[in-house]
Swiss-Prot record:
Major location category of this protein: membrane
Name this polypeptide is given: Phosphatidylserine decarboxylase proenzyme
Keywords per UniProt: Cell membrane, Decarboxylase, Lipid biosynthesis, Lipid metabolism, Lyase, Membrane, Phospholipid biosynthesis, Phospholipid metabolism, Pyruvate, Zymogen
Post-translational modification: Is synthesized initially as an inactive proenzyme. Formation of the active enzyme involves a self-maturation process in which the active site pyruvoyl group is generated from an internal serine residue via an autocatalytic post-translational modification. Two non-identical subunits are generated from the proenzyme in this reaction, and the pyruvate is formed at the N-terminus of the alpha chain, which is derived from the carboxyl end of the proenzyme.
Residues of the active site: D89 (charge relay system), H146 (charge relay system), S252 (charge relay system), S252 (schiff-base intermediate with substrate)
Encoding gene per record: psd
Keyword Iron listed: no
Organism field: Shewanella loihica (strain ATCC BAA-1088 / PV-4)
Pathway of action: Phospholipid metabolism; phosphatidylethanolamine biosynthesis; phosphatidylethanolamine from CDP-diacylglycerol: step 2/2
Pyruvic acid (Ser) PTM positions: S252
Residues of the site described as Cleavage (non-hydrolytic): G251, S252
Quaternary structure, from the entry: Heterodimer of a large membrane-associated beta subunit and a small pyruvoyl-containing alpha subunit.
EC number in record: 4.1.1.65
Gene Ontology terms, MF aspect: phosphatidylserine decarboxylase activity
Top enzyme category: lyase
Length: 286
């Protein structure tokens, strides 16, 4: 059955399906939308007591529900300045060192940081010998993405690609998954050096948004797009630790890269399959 699920992903029209689901998720269909939201809450056992708006009827579209805000204070930030924090609610897929420019995906699978970053060689060099962490957001999770540490945006890259599912089964069976899927790479300058936050698209992920650019929707095609941002002056985009930096519409994966010697060690309990909560201690900084 698992082999069949993987095989179907290779042949299904993933981009067409994702566009269709995206339109449906954005539609405001009144009672129909509310019924779908109620089914989703029950199916995935979502704790709506954490949401700023707990009633399904409060959301005009499925997208509004999926990108729902949490109640203030429900995810307190780790107040130890020696630690950066988890950027999302999810589960750790993998974490560890970047070895000779390679990132571990799953048993028998790895990919290059160069490919992940859209073949931007200068960017990849900045993370040689550093560390990475991959966090998977399941459908039940809170889908806003926050800053692990205060940072100033220096570059954004949009990389077109496939839209395979990014669940654990696919990660274990599709080579180079996160460097094959459509993604948005945001590079920040921080007190511990450069940090890359790679927001990876997936099947039925309607779009990826950032707080500075909105929905990232370059023209369709195979071209990589890059944007450079000033890191000083009134136009610099600086986000505080814990501040929202983006969101997924229908969920996916975040891959983070850190420079060599930026992290002393990952926090206790940060290991594959560990559940993460935004704001909890993620890694001790060097």
């Amino acid at each position: 059955m698992d082999k069949l699920k993987i095989a179907l992903q290779y042949i299904m029209p993933k981009h067409l399906l994702s566009r269709l689901v995206g339109k449906l998720a954005a539609a405001e269909l009144g009672a129909v939308t509310t019924s779908v939201i109620k089914w989703f809450i029950k199916q995935y056992k979502i704790d709506m007591s954490e949401a700023a708006q707990s009633a399904p009827e409060a959301y005009a579209s499925f997208n509004q529900f999926f990108t729902r805000a949490l109640k203030p204070g429900i995810r307190p930030l780790c107040d130890d300045d020696d630690y950066i924090v988890h950027p999302v609610d999810g589960a750790v897929s993998q974490c560890g060192p970047i070895k000779e420019g390679r990132i571990f995906q799953a048993k028998g699978h790895e990919y290059s940081s160069l490919a992940l970053l859209g073949d931007q060689a200068d960017d990849a060099k900045r993370f040689e010998g550093g560390d990475f962490a991959t966090i998977y957001l399941a459908p039940k999770d809170y889908h806003r993405i926050h800053m692990p540490i205060k940072g100033t945006l220096s570059k954004m890259t949009y990389v077109p690609g496939e839209l395979f599912s990014v669940n654990p089964l696919t990660a274990e069976n599709v080579p180079g998954l996160f460097a094959r899927n459509e993604r948005v790479v945001a590079i920040f300058e921080t007190e511990i050096g450069p940090m890359a936050m790679v927001l990876v698209g997936a099947t039925i992920v309607a779009s990826i948004e950032t707080v500075w650019a909105g929905t990232v929707t370059p023209p369709t095609g195979k071209k990589v797009f890059t944007w450079d941002y000033p890191t000083e002056g009134p136009e610099a985009i600086t986000l505080d630790k814990g501040e929202e930096m983006g969101r997924f519409k229908l969920g996916s994966t975040v891959v983070m890269l850190f420079a060599k010697d930026a992290l002393e060690h990952f926090a206790d309990g940060v290991e594959p399959k560990a559940v993460t909560r935004m704001g909890q201690a993620f890694a001790k900084i060097d």
